[in-house]
């Protein structure tokens, strides 16, 4: 993976998420509430179910609608000022570009009309040589933009047409960027960081052109700040501009069919980048004797065969996003090789300008660069003019400490708790694409991406080390769906494939060639107990089916136990009557006293006694007449249930500690007749486990009682088992506050 700090500062230089759709946010709009946490997650899921997030129906980032905000500004005669990404030091960065850094001294925010007369959004079209890097270390982003400019139809999906500094100008622009499985529409104001009336970051070779600077600002807004863009991989930018999936190739050990893969990539309109990897910071941006920059992101912009000395020579066109410093070896702008090529080919290919773009032979490319990255485009990205051979599916998921962050196979006790996904590959590839002759194989590209790390860098977040393992499904487990496989499966069966390495990069991917059949993919962090969100994408050359292996939320509906006073021993009756008094019923406080007196003899549990919340849940569960109290028979039934749950707890407490490990919670709840999917389990562990991922007996009982009560409420109101109920606000408040 490539990380580069970008061009050094000159010695004289001193400077340097989606929710509801109702109203726009910004200086020209009314303020609205924003969703956070679980509410935001549920709302986003609902929006995606309605098709929001597709490119033709992009989700408005931060609930900001470009059309509504621009219309409001035009109506009021104001220029847009973005409250979500203000023209303030906080938008520049947090450390090297932080408010107290000398790198940001004398930076001012200016609109293009304050910098130059008659600014243009786009001037005479767009080409890879239009853009130059500023002082920010985001050469990877510029290399991606440079590659994007070679495919205008893709570029104008990211940079919507019809934007200018003249017609309907209101100081607001917008861009569409792919983020972790969905397209988002990002608006920005046109206040840009400058010094001495010159742009500090990305800028065009033409001083009056501003589309690239505004696109960089939109990407910085998504990432939280400009500094968050420092360091990265060209493929990250290409994926976010196309929604495609990346593959990496080490050129010291290139696959035998690499040239064929390159030709296919060009045919499929794939976008490409390359670099010379470094092993230490001292090598960053040092030059080779052929004027190539180490640790720097280049874009690959073309492939051409030419007649040279009686044979065909394959040339590759490469671009340095700095817009200068070019390869000076064979086939460079002034190389003698061009003199032996037909003049019409020279005119077509050769442009002797210092624009950062150059040609080199395929062999020199292999000898000088160490990493090639190819971004394969997905069918929804491409129009009819382009070809794509991929069928795609994707899933979003989370690793959560204590419930679904099981770590890699080195941790068999928790590995099985990771999210699980199943894929069916019924059909082999076409014979002409199968280099293995008569062996039927299915090409499958699996890509695992962790989400939102750039935005969290300001809080010190680091990329997790991630990877995945793939298992072939044995016959006895085929066609199953609503089940989360347990530890025994993974200790019995061997894996069938895996990501090449576990690595702390945004994405890991592997292209696998598998026999037709069913497979299970387990994505994980390397170490357990690491929180992260992820996107898993599966690309196949033929039709495939896939789904998440997870439990369906379910509770056994057991017959209510019946008891009579004849079943009760005299000590039990005597104790109840003492606590209940003359009323013969007990409320929440009496229930708490009674249970805690009866539980004294249970020495095998670590307990501080039953809390009031747990006792309220018990009354909610057992109270049939709505009185808020329990009679003798109701209490006896409750006590029998509690004893049963105690037995289950004791059975699962294998180390006899009187507590449970949070990863065992799923097994305990299943033994008690309830099955929960990953999303619900994550909530339970977050609520009931302590910092050491331990659940004591009190928390277990409180959790289980709440589950039983909520299932009972829901199923009572859903007699036809539709899986949905409808509540008014009043009913919702009544049930949640009481339950």
Curated annotation (Swiss-Prot):
Known tissue expression: Highest expression in testis.
Main localisation:
cytoplasm
Which residues does the record give as Ca(2+) 2 binding sites?
653, 655, 657, 659, 664
Domain Calpain catalytic, by residue range, is 79-378
Signal peptide stretch:
none
Protein name as annotated: Calpain-11
Origin species: Homo sapiens (Human)
Region of interest: Linker: 552-567
Q: Which SUPFAM superfamilies match?
A: Calpain large subunit, middle domain (domain III) (SSF49758), Cysteine proteinases (SSF54001), EF-hand (SSF47473)
In Pfam terms, one family for this protein is Peptidase_C2
The record's PROSITE patterns line, in alphabetical order, gives: CALPAIN_CAT, EF_HAND_1, EF_HAND_2, THIOL_PROTEASE_CYS
| Family the entry assigns | Belongs to the peptidase C2 family.
Q: What does this protein's UniProt record list under function?
A: Calcium-regulated non-lysosomal thiol-protease which catalyzes limited proteolysis of substrates involved in cytoskeletal remodeling and signal transduction.
């Amino acid at each position: 993976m490539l990380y580069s700090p970008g061009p050094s500062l000159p010695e004289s230089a001193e400077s340097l998420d989606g929710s509801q759709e109702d109203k726009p946010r910004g200086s020209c709009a009314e303020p609205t509430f924003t969703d956070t946490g679980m509410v935001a997650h549920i709302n986003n899921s609902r929006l995606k179910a309605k098709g929001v997030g597709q490119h033709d129906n992009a989700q408005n980032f931060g609930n900001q609608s470009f059309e509504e905000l621009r219309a409001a500004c035009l109506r009021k005669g104001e220029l847009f000022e973005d409250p979500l990404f203000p023209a303030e030091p906080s938008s520049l960065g947090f450390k090297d570009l932080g408010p107290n850094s000398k790198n940001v001294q004398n930076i001012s925010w200016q609109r293009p009309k304050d910098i130059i007369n008659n600014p243009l959004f786009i001037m005479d079209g767009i080409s890879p040589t239009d853009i130059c890097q500023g002082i920010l270390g985001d050469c990877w982003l510029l290399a991606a933009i440079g590659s994007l400019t070679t495919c205008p139809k893709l570029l104008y999906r990211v940079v919507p047409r019809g934007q200018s500094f003249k017609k309907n100008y209101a100081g607001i622009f917008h861009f569409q960027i792919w983020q972790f499985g969905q397209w988002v529409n990002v608006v920005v104001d046109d206040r840009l960081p400058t010094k001495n009336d010159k742009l500090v970051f990305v800028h065009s070779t033409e001083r009056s052109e501003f589309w690239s600077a505004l696109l960089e600002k939109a990407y910085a807004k998504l990432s939280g700040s400009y500094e968050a863009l420092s360091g990265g991989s060209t493929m990250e930018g290409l994926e976010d501009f196309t929604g495609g999936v990346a593959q990496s190739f080490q050129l010291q050990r290139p696959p035998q069919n690499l040239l064929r893969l390159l030709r296919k990539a060009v045919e499929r309109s794939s976008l490409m980048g390359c670099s010379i990897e470094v092993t230490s910071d001292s090598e960053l941006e040092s030059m080779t004797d052929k004027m190539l920059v180490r640790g720097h992101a280049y874009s690959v912009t073309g492939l051409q065969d030419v007649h040279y000395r009686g044979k065909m020579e394959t040339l590759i066109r490469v671009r340095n996003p700095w817009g200068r410093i070019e390869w000076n070896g064979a086939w460079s702008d002034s190389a003698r090789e061009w003199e032996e090529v037909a003049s019409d080919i020279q005119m077509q290919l050769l442009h002797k300008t210092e624009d950062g773009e150059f040609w080199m032979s395929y062999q020199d490319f292999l000898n000088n660069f160490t990493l090639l990255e190819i971004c394969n485009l997905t069918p929804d990205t491409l129009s009819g003019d382009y070809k794509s051979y991929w069928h795609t599916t994707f899933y979003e998921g989370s690793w959560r400490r204590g419930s679904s962050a099981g770590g890699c196979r080195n941790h068999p006790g928790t590995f099985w708790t990771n999210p699980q996904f199943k894929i069916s590959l019924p059909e082999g590839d076409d014979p002409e694409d199968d280099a293995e002759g008569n062996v039927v194989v299915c090409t499958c590209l699996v890509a695992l991406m962790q989400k939102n790390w750039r935005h969290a860098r300001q809080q010190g977040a680091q990329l997790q080390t991630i990877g995945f393992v793939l298992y072939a499904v044995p016959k006895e487990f085929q066609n199953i769906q609503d089940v989360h496989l347990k530890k025994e499966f993974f200790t019995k069966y061997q894996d069938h494939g895996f990501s090449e390495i576990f690595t702390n990069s945004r994405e890991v991917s592997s292209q696998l060639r598998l026999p037709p059949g069913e497979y299970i993919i387990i994505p994980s962090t390397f170490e357990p107990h690491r929180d992260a969100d992820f996107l898993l994408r599966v690309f196949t050359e033929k039709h495939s089916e896939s789904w998440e292996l997870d439990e369906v939320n379910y509770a056994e509906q057991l017959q209510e136990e019946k008891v009579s006073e004849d079943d009760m021993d005299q000590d039990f009756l005597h104790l109840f009557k003492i606590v209940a008094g003359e009323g013969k019923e007990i409320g929440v406080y009496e229930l708490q006293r009674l249970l805690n007196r009866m539980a004294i003899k249970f020495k095998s549990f670590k307990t501080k006694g039953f809390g009031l919340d747990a006792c309220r849940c018990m009354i909610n569960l057992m109270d049939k007449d709505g009185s808020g109290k329990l009679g003798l028979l109701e209490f006896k039934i409750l006590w029998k249930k509690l004893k049963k749950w105690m037995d289950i707890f004791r059975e699962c407490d294998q180390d006899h500690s009187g507590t449970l490990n949070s990863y065992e919670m799923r097994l305990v709840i299943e033994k008690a007749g309830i099955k929960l999917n990953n999303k619900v389990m994550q909530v339970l562990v977050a609520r009931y486990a302590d910092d050491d991922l331990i659940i004591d007996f009190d928390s277990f009982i409180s959790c289980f009682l709440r589950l039983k009560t909520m299932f009972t409420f829901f199923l009572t109101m859903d007699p036809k088992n539709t899986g949905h109920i409808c509540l008014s606000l009043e009913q919702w408040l009544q049930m949640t506050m009481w339950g």
